[in-house]
Amino acid sequence: MATVALLRSLRRRELHAAHISAYKFSSASAGGRTTELRLHGVKDIIAVASGKGGVGKSSTAVNLAVALANKCELKIGLLDADVYGPSVPIMMNINQKPQVNQDMKMIPVENYGVKCMSMGLLVEKDAPLVWRGPMVMSALAKMTKGVDWGDLDILVVDMPPGTGDAQISISQNLKLSGAVIVSTPQDVALADANRGISMFDKVRVPILGLVENMSCFVCPHCNEPSFIFGKEGARRTAAKKGLKLIGEIPLEMSIREGSDEGVPVVVSSPGSIVSKAYQDLAQNVVKGLKELRENPDNEIQMKLNVPHSSHSS
């Protein structure tokens, strides 16, 4: 079976980790990027990242990808690079093993107009991935170069949370066009978001902007906002860093329900306020990538404008 052969290959590669030069991290290369994993037919690759777990990075990546495909009418792929905690199969309602084409490349599983690949599709459900770094890097190589992505406008990469070796290696070896940093408004999450910003700066990946997830909770009875995790923390952080806030996503039960049921909220409730927030985020990402192409020297600061949320005052 192709997926079994893949996992055996990964184990062999772990034993020969010294030969995985494409993913070998060197502090001397921190100032530049390699092109080892440039993907044929993929115009742009963007990372959706967070400095810590639990801030809604994966739900943001999923709804952003679906909004890019359906609202912006683009050809989109979604790579679940969160190897230790893959959640894309559940959120996108995909559970079938990927097929292998005549070139021995895996064919991504498609749903909601998005081509998806995840380690969660290749291992048994609930099976723990007790892997060391080289094996993780080898797996990610298989899920990029070993996949027939076809022609894509954007490949959205759901990054592992944090700023460790895996995140740095992915950022260096995938030809990232830009990164989106997801955070909640509270100080502890923003401190970790700052570390993520610094990491992408060091590996010279342009930052498209920050997304403030769980920005507020709007009472369904009185329509009054409650700023449970703080107010406008990501906006202030973006301003201090000279970046832009490109999305504000409210705390809403429909996001959680959609994630658990495998129906992204932009599909289940396309006219809702929260879906509009994801659609605005998608449009801002497209604008940011367009600006980078037109102004390649302007790698960090995106001239985007996100109006204050109607619940911010």
UniProtKB/Swiss-Prot annotation:
InterPro entries: Mrp/NBP35_ATP-bd, NUBPL-like, P-loop_NTPase, YlxH/NBP35. This is Iron-sulfur protein required for NADH dehydrogenase, mitochondrial. Disruption phenotype: Homozygous mutants are lethal, seeds failing to germinate or arrested seedlings in early growth. Loss of mitochondrial complex I and low levels of a 650-kDa assembly intermediate associated with a reduced mitochondrial translation activity. Heterozygous plants display delayed bolting and flowering, with small and highly branched inflorescences; they also have sporophytic defects in female and male gametophyte development. Essential during early vegetative growth. Required for the assembly of the mitochondrial membrane respiratory chain NADH dehydrogenase (Complex I). Involved in mitochondrial translation activity. May deliver of one or more Fe-S clusters to complex I subunits. GO terms for cellular component: mitochondrial matrix; mitochondrion. The keyword Nucleus does not apply. The lineage of its organism: Eukaryota, Viridiplantae, Streptophyta, Embryophyta, Tracheophyta. The gene is INDH. Residues 1-22 form a transit peptide. Binds 1 [4Fe-4S] cluster. It is found in: Mitochondrion matrix. Its cofactor is [4Fe-4S] cluster. One of its GO terms (biological process) is iron-sulfur cluster assembly.
